[in-house]
Amino acid sequence: MLDAFAKVVAQADARGEFLSSQQIDALSDIIAEGNKRLDTVNKINSNASAIVTNSARALFAEQPQLAQPGGNAYPSRRMAACLRDMEIVLRYVSYAIAAGDSSVLDDRCLNGLRETYQALGTPGSSVAVAIQKMKEASISLANDVNGVPLGDCSSLVAELSVYFDRAAASVV
């Protein structure tokens, strides 16, 4: 996993060049957006339990068969595993938004996830719905301007959306 700074330095080093003014400008933009990025990560982390719990409740309200006898989230140990998995995905999305890069999400969370769920008989489409619900909650938090530095957060929200979409697509 390389952060944006390491990538830029590695690119310049591979060419045997100093950082260009364009690369320096890009890094300056990253620094300027850093507080918003960290605020978003902090909001997600501070609300992780509620994000996961509320998303699971919404999923089970839409798909009650999952939590009933014979469902993939029944009995309680399977429900706990479901909540744990949702929390892991959310945690890795928060790492990706902090790093500004999806490689940690891809490498440590998503690679092989579809195959694991298939082997367990877990419906990937239901997992994708849960991830989309976490996405909605996280984007709502990211868009909450209360206590966030002034400025446009649309690119950060779009980036956050991409990470959740990537996670949802990886399980179906």
Curated annotation (Swiss-Prot):
It comes from Aglaothamnion neglectum (Red alga). GO terms for biological process: photosynthesis. It is a peripheral membrane protein. (2R,3E)-phycocyanobilin 1 binds at C82. Keywords: Antenna complex, Bile pigment, Chloroplast, Chromophore, Electron transport, Membrane, Methylation, Photosynthesis, Phycobilisome, Plastid, Thylakoid, Transport. This is C-phycocyanin beta chain. The gene is cpcB. GO terms for cellular component: chloroplast thylakoid membrane; phycobilisome. Belongs to the phycobiliprotein family. The modification N4-methylasparagine is found at N72.
